[in-house]
Amino acid sequence: MLCVNVELRERSYPIHIGMGLLSEPQVYPLKKGDKVMIVTNPTVAQYYLSSITDTLEKIGCSVENVQLPEGEQYKTLESLDLIFTALLKANHGRDTSIIALGGGVIGDIAGYAAASYQRGVRFIQIPTTLLAQVDSSVGGKTAVNHKLGKNMIGAFYQPCAVIIDTLTLTTLPKREIHAGLAEVIKYGAILDDEFFTWLEKHITNLVALEQQYLQQCIARCCQIKADVVTRDETEKGERALLNLGHTFGHAIETHLGYGNWLHGEAVATGMMIAAVLSNKLGDLSLNDVTRLEKLLTQADLPTASPDTMKAEDYLPHMMRDKKVLAGKLRLVLLKSLGQAYVATDTDKEYVLDAIRTCSKKS
C-alpha cells in the first residue's frame, strides 16, 4: 500500500492507495459505535456496497446508505436534498460520518452534503473512477451544478481520509478510464515535465490497467495535487493551475448538456484549445502542442471541439467561470510542458481563433 499525506495542520489527512483496500478495516478512520451514511449510486452499489458495509460493521459501525441517480445531470440541489432527507430520517447527528462511494459526481455531492449538514460532519472519500482517484477526491472541492453553470454552488471541505482501491477500476467502462487519463495528463502538462515524459512511455500500460503502473501514476498525481493544496488550499493563486483545460471544458459540458460528454473528455479538448492558444500567443512551442495532442490521442481522448458548438458558443459560459475577476477572463495556459501560468484578460479574438483551429480538427 502507498500513502500520500495532504498536510493542512489539524486538518491533514492520508490518501491510501492499493489493491483490495475496501475490505481492510485499518484504512477507515472509524471506531465502534460510529454512525455512517454511505452515498453512492446503483451501479457502484452493486459491486462494492455490500463488502464495504460488512467491513464497517466488523469495526462496529452502524451503516446506512442512500443511492442517487447516476450522471453529471443529477449533480443538483435535488440530489443533495435526498441525502439530507436520508440523514434526518435516520436521526444522524453532528457525530455522523458521510462516505462518498463512487466517482466525481458522488464525491462532489456527498462532500457538499458533509460540509452543509448540521454545519459540518466527518467525510471520507472512496473514489471508484480514475478521474476521481487522481483529482476530484483530493483537495476538498465540493459542489453541485446550477443550470447556468457547473460547480456554482459549493464549498471547500476536506475529507478526513481518501481510500483508493485500484481494483475498482477493473469494473469501469473503458470510456471512463480514458476520461480519467485526461486529468492524469493534465498534471504532467502543468507542473511536471518528467511525469509527462513518463506518461508518453507508459500510456499503453495505464490504458491496459497494469497495476504496477496504475498505482505509481495515481500516487504521483495525488502527490502533485497534495503539494499544491498544501500551499494554496482555497485557490487564491497556484491551485488555479489545476484548472488547465477546465474553463473551455466546462463550457462544452454546459452547452451540450451535462452527461453528453464526460468531464475528462471535455477537459481533454479544453487542454488542446489552451495549448493551441498558448502557441498563438508565442509561448508554447509547436512541438509541445504536437506532443500533447499525440498523448491525448493515445489515451483515446477527443482533441477537437464538438461539431455542434461554434466558437462564439463558448464565451457566455466561460464568462461565468469562477476564475473570472472584475469581469475579466482568466485562463490557465502553458509556457512549456510542465510549466503553466494564469493569463489575465487574454484578447478574445485570440481565444476564438484557438477554438476555431481546434474545431477544424473534427
UniProtKB/Swiss-Prot annotation:
The family database entries (Gene3D superfamilies) matched by this protein are listed as:
3.40.50.1970, Dehydroquinate synthase-like - alpha domain (1.20.1090.10)
Q: So what EC number does this one have?
A: 4.2.3.4
Chief place where the protein resides: cytoplasm
Which coenzyme or cofactor does it need? Co(2+); Zn(2+); NAD(+)
Sorted alphabetically, the keyword list is: Amino-acid biosynthesis, Aromatic amino acid biosynthesis, Cobalt, Cytoplasm, Lyase, Metal-binding, NAD, Nucleotide-binding, Zinc
Record-level GO cellular component terms: cytoplasm
**Does this UniProt record's set of keywords contain 4Fe-4S?**
no
One GO MF annotation is: nucleotide binding
Q: Binding positions for Zn(2+)?
A: E183, H246, H263
Q: How is the cofactor bound?
A: Binds 1 divalent metal cation per subunit. Can use either Co(2+) or Zn(2+).
Q: Which residues bind NAD(+)?
A: 70-75, 104-108, 128-129, 141, 150, 168-171
- PANTHER family xrefs: 3-DEHYDROQUINATE SYNTHASE, 3-DEHYDROQUINATE SYNTHASE, CHLOROPLASTIC
Instruction: Write the protein's name.
Output: 3-dehydroquinate synthase
